Amino acid sequence: MTRLLVVSHTVSPPLAELVDIVVVSAKNAAAEIGVDLDLRTRPALTGSALDVLEADGIIFGTPVNIGYMSGALKHFFDQIYYPCMNETTSLPYGYFLHGNNDAAGAVAAIDTIVGALKWRRVGAPLQVTAGITPTGRQELTDLTSRVVAAAAGL
């Protein structure tokens, strides 16, 4: 059984739609590669170190507020950092962001945190500004598929 954890702070309809795309894409990817998937979704404010410790892969999503990740996702990282620091090395992950402007600060902050955790990024972060395009939908589907495959050890 492959466990995929999806952690997000979904304060807007577009972000909720992105999470829905991840959930459907993860199930489809698992079926396509013949993997039994235990998919767990958690709000960033309630996700825990135990959730991460039990996961084989993780995808997280955040709004970009004033050029930075949401406080909720930062809170999640603060809660899991020390318990997971030496226990989750090489955990495959991917992430997506939604905002109406530049996400460079959010990307830099997230990359710094997951770099310190020594997790393994399996695809470039997806940055969605304004609406979700068919291209953005496909890129998120592809990212999710890569995380599922990596979580399954493929």
Question: What is the predicted function of each stretch?
Answer:
Residues 1-8, 44-58, 141-144, 148-153:
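Glycine/serine-rich loop-strand microenvironments at binding/catalytic pocket rims
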Residues 2-30:
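N-terminal beta1-alpha1 ligand-phosphate binding loop
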Residues 12-13, 97-102, 128-133:
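Short histidine/acidic/glycine/proline-rich micro-motifs that form metal-
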Residues 18-19, 72, 106, 136-139:
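Residues at alpha-helix caps and immediate loop-helix transition turns in enzyme cores, especially N-
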Residues 21-35, 115-120:
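Short helix-loop-beta junction
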Residues 31-34, 48, 120-154:
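Glycine-rich phosphate/pyrophosphate-binding loop and the adjoining helix
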Residues 37-41:
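Generic structural signal for residues in well-ordered beta-strands
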Residues 44-121:
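Helix-loop-strand module that forms the ligand-binding subsite of alpha/beta enzymes
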